A protein has these predicted regions:
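Active-site-proximal helices and loops of the catalytic beta/alpha 8
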Residues: 167, 171, 197, 257, ...
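DNA major-groove recognition helix of helix-turn-helix/homeodomain DNA-binding modules
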Residues: 18-37, 180
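Aromatic/acidic polysaccharide-binding cleft in carbohydrate-active enzymes
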Residues: 312, 358-380, 385-427
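N-terminal structural segment of carbohydrate-active enzymes
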Residues: 73-179, 184-186, 191-195, 230, ...
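Aromatic- and acidic-residue-enriched segments that line the glycan-binding/catalytic groove
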Residues: 143-155, 183-222, 310-322, 416
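Carbohydrate-binding surface patches
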Residues: 454-488
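Short, charged recognition helix plus adjacent turn
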Residues: 36-70
Length: 523
C-alpha cells in the first residue's frame, strides 16, 4: 500500500514523488483529482524557473510576459523530450508520388489526419513528449528528402489545411512542433529544376544549381549537375546564389506564418556551408524576435566536433551520433566504458570536455538506422537503455513505435524503418519510458545538470547530474542479475524519482536486473 505521508506529499505537489507512486495511488485510492498537482509543470522544479513543458498558448508579447514566462519561451528546448514521426511512413503513403491524389475525395487523400483521428496526439502527450519532430511533409518525388514543392503538403498526405489541423492539435496538447528543413538538395521533380531541364541555360533558375553544361546526367539531360552523395535524383542546391537563399528564407517564414511551427530540423546540416548556416541562424533569430519565443534549429550531424554546427551563429543543437553508437554498443558488448567515455568526453567537468552546458539531441534510433529493438542483442535491456537515454545529458528523442518495441532492419532499404502503423500501442516499455520522461521533467538536474562519473563496470554505470544545488544519481544495471553497487554518493539517503521510494546508500545500493534508478540526493 501507499503511506498516508506519501499521499500528502502528492497532494502538496511534491516534485520528488515518482510517477510510479502516483500511478499506484491513482489505482489504489482513486485520487485522480488530487494527484494532478504533482506533475503540473508549474509545481515542478523546472516550472518554478520557467523551463516547464510547452504550453498551448504562448505569451506573444514580451511586455506581457512575466520573467518566468519569458524564460520558458526562450529556453523551452533544453528541457524538451522530442518525439519523431516520419509521416509518409506512419500514415501509409505510397512509396512514390504520381501526383494523382490531391486531397479531395476520400480518407486516403487525407492520410495526415490519422495523427489526429487515430489517437497519436493523445499518445504523444501521455508519453510525456513536449515536442514533435515531423519529417518531410511537403511535395516530393518519393521519400520526402527529394522535394518538389516546399509550399504544398505532399499529395499522398493531404492538404495544407490538414497539416494546420495536425499542428494545432499538438499545440493544444501543449506539444511544440518542428518541421524537417531539407535545404541542401531537392528532387529532380523540383519545379525550378524542371524549368532548367526545359529551358537549359535560359532558365532564370539555372544559377540555383551547380550545372555542368558540357556534361551529361544518367537521365540524358544534356547537362551534368552536382548531386548529394552521388545520388543522381538528389540535386544539390547552390547556396552561393542569393535569389535561391531569398526564396528559401521565404519558405521558412511562410511555414512559421502559415503553420505556427516552433523550429526546424536541418537535414544533412553537416553538408551545409557555414555561411549558409549563419544565414539560417539570422532567419531563426528574426522569427524568435517576432514570436517572443526561441525558434529552434537542430542540425543533423554525424561525427566530428559538433561545435562546428552548434553555436550562436549556427544551430542550437546537433544530432549526437557519437553517443548513439555508444548507447547500443555498450549494451551488446557488455562494455559500459564505451558510453561512459563518450559522456565524459562530451559533458564532463574538465576544461577539455567538448559540449558541457550544451544540449545535443540524443536517441537510440531514428528513420535512418535500425530500430533499437532489432539492434540490441538482449531485448531485456531496452528499459535500462531508455533509462540511460533520459538520464544522460542532452535532449532525448524517441522514434515513433520504438516506445513499444517494434523492430526494423535496413536489409531492403529504409522502408522497414518507416512502417505504416494504425493506432499507437502501449506496453510495459512504454509505461517505463513515460515514467523516465516524467521524472526528468521534474528535475532541473536531469534536464540542465552537469555530468560526473561515479562508477563504471562492464554492465553497470553510475553517474551524477548536478544543477543549482540539486544532485541526481543515475544508476544503470544492464546485467541479467541483480547486483549491489558501492560508490561515494556524497549523502546518506535519496528518493527515487521514478518509483518514489526512499533509498539508503549506507550498506551499498542494491539494484535489480536490467534496472535504472534516478536517485534525488538529500543534502
Amino acid at each position: 500500500g501507499v503511506s498516508r505521508d506519501t499521499i500528502s506529499r502528492v497532494e502538496r505537489g511534491d516534485a520528488s514523488v515518482g510517477i510510479g507512486t502516483v500511478l499506484d495511488i491513482c489505482g489504489e485510492f482513486g485520487l485522480l483529482g488530487k494527484v494532478g498537482a504533482a506533475f503540473d509543470p508549474a509545481n515542478s522544479e523546472l516550472g518554478k524557473i520557467g523551463l516547464s513543458r510547452g504550453v498551448p498558448k504562448r505569451v506573444r508579447k514580451a511586455q506581457d510576459a512575466s520573467p518566468e514566462e519569458w524564460r520558458n519561451n526562450m529556453n523551452w528546448y533544453e528541457s524538451s523530450f522530442v518525439y519523431q514521426i516520419y509521416p509518409l511512413g506512419l500514415c501509409g503513403a505510397p512509396w512514390s508520388n504520381d501526383g494523382s491524389t490531391q486531397g479531395a475525395t476520400n480518407d486516403d487523400d487525407h492520410r495526415l489526419l490519422r495523427l489526429v483521428n487515430d489517437g497519436w496526439v493523445e499518445h504523444v502527450s501521455r508519453l510525456g513528449a513536449t515536442c514533435v519532430m515531423l519529417n518531410p511533409v511537403f511535395e516530393s518525388d518519393a521519400h520526402g528528402y527529394d522535394t518538389r514543392d516546399y509550399t504544398r503538403v505532399d499529395a499522398r498526405l493531404g492538404t495544407n489545411d490538414d497539416l494546420k489541423t495536425v499542428v494545432d492539435a499538438f499545440h493544444e496538447a501543449g506539444i511544440r512542433v518542428m518541421f524537417d528543413g531539407v535545404f541542401n538538395h531537392v528532387g529532380r521533380g523540383f519545379w525550378a529544376f524542371q524549368d532548367v531541364i526545359a529551358k537549359r541555360a535560359d532558365s532564370h533558375y539555372a544559377g540555383w544549381f551547380n550545372i555542368d553544361w558540357n556534361g551529361n546526367s544518367p537521365y540524358e539531360d544534356g547537362f551534368g549537375y552536382e548531386t548529394w552523395g552521388g545520388v543522381p535524383y538528389l540535386v544539390k542546391l547552390n547556396h552561393n546564389n542569393l535569389d535561391l537563399n531569398d526564396y528559401l528564407a521565404g519558405v521558412i517564414r511562410g511555414w512559421e506564418s502559415e503553420f505556427d511551427i516552433d523550429g526546424l530540423r536541418l537535414d544533412v546540416a553537416y553538408c551545409l556551408d557555414p555561411g549558409y548556416l549563419g544565414y539560417l541562424r539570422r532567419i531563426a533569430n528574426e522569427l524568435t524576435e517576432k514570436r517572443d519565443e526561441k525558434f529552434i534549429l537542430v542540425g543533423e550531424t554525424m561525427f566530428g566536433d559538433y561545435n562546428r554546427w552548434m553555436s550562436d551563429d549556427a544551430c542550437d543543437s546537433a544530432y549526437n551520433y557519437e553517443a548513439y553508437k555508444g548507447l547500443w554498443s555498450s549494451m551488446n558488448s557488455a562494455n559500459m566504458h564505451e558510453i561512459a567515455y563518450a559522456l565524459e568526453r562530451q559533458s564532463g567537468d574538465k576544461p577539455w570536455d567538448l559540449y558541457t552546458g550544451k544540449h545535443l539531441l540524443t536517441f537510440v534510433d531514428n528513420h535512418d538506422v535500425p530500430r533499437i529493438a532489432t539492434q540490441l542483442t538482449d531485448k531485456h535491456q531496452l528499459g535500462c537503455l531508455y533509462g540511460l537515454l533520459f538520464g544522460m545529458c542532452g535532449v532525448p528523442c524517441v522514434y515513433y513505435g520504438s516506445e513499444w518495441g517494434i523492430e526494423g532492419a535496413q536489409s531492403f532499404g529504409d522502408h522497414e524503418l518507416r512502417p505504416a502503423l494504425d493506432a499507437p500501442q502501449w506496453s510495459e516499455l512504454t509505461d517505463l519510458i513515460a515514467a523516465f520522461a516524467a521524472a526528468r521533467l521534474q528535475s532541473e538536474a536531469l534536464c540542465m545538470g552537469d555530468y560526473h562519473e561515479l562508477q563504471c563496470q562492464p554492465q553497470q554505470l553510475v553517474f551524477q547530474r548536478s544543477c543549482a544545488g540539486k544532485r541526481v544519481i543515475v544508476a544503470i544495471n544492464a546485467a541479467s542479475q541483480p547486483t549491489t553497487l558501492h560508490f561515494d554518493a556524497g549523502c546518506g539517503r535519496a528518493v527515487d524519482l521514478v518509483t518514489g521510494e526512499d533509498h539508503d546508500f549506507g550498506a551499498g545500493s542494491e539494484v535489480g536486473a536490467y534496472s535504472c534508478h534516478y536517485w534525488l540526493c538529500e543534502r
